[in-house]
């Protein structure tokens, strides 16, 4: 059974380019092996991530993320059964979220992933994918 999981977390320290590159490389390798797809949204001091795949694989990965010492304030926003993947083209992709981004300010001036609905979070992700160029690591 396929599921789509959406969570938000904060890094323990500052997000660096080196950290992001390492996350993308490790995620892409692991996700390809486990047939997981998804996207990572980074910015404003947080990570917002979607994972798609077989329930057991996604649950195991989410458990690893929750116990990862690089994450804090990990919060599950949604998990749902799906019939098809939304992000099937990427084992992992990256988009940037910035509260200084005019598109984000105009469309969602008060966006806070910890308070937002999953629907609003997916709308933001869709807009970021359409208006930006996801950094792919497949």
Give the positions of each predicted feature.
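Charge-rich, low-complexity N-terminal segments
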Residues: 1-138
